[in-house]
Amino acid sequence: LIVGQAPGIRVHNTGIPWNDPSGDRLRHWTNLDKKTFYDINQIAIIPMGFCYPGTGPSGDLPPRKECASLWLAKLLAGLPNIQLTLLIGQYAQQHYLGKQAKTNLTQTVASFADYLPTYFPLPHPSPRNNIWLKRNPWFEKFILPALRITCSTILSITP
């Protein structure tokens, strides 16, 4: 299961989740091709918000809270065989991890092993997060290989 934030304007307009540069980066991070990524028999994609929330001063606004409270439990009830949930960004992490989340996203992502095998927290793959990625080179060096191995093992794909 991939839990993101809310669709950006491009995704909102096309109706295809992760159909933007963030999705390209997420597929690179997970080492999944588009065919596998969008295979509904292997991967479910659920955002925290289902509509484009609009733009704020530093990017898209947060997902609207009423979406998650109204739909998430109902959708998850229809997904009984979830083996791993990728928590993309702070909103998904705060919702699913609650008090188990660390003080901030960086600490939560660095502590990914604490949440396995159920969850794998990740930063949002948006190009707006390039500064975070540059400030945290350990993410690419240590976290991405672990993510790729975890995904390939669950999906029975050769890394």
Can you say where each PLM-predicted feature lies in the sequence?
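Short, basic/glycine-rich phosphate-binding loops at helix/coil junctions
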Residues: A6-R10, Q42-P57
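Adenosine ribonucleotide-centric catalytic and binding domains
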Residues: L1-Q42
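Glycine/proline-rich loop-helix segments at beta-alpha junctions forming the active-site rim
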Residues: G49-P159
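Generic beta-strand or strand-like secondary-structure segments
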Residues: P21, R25-L32, P47, C67, ...
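Residue-level preference for alpha-helix termini and adjacent loops
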Residues: G15-P17, Q42, P47, S111, ...
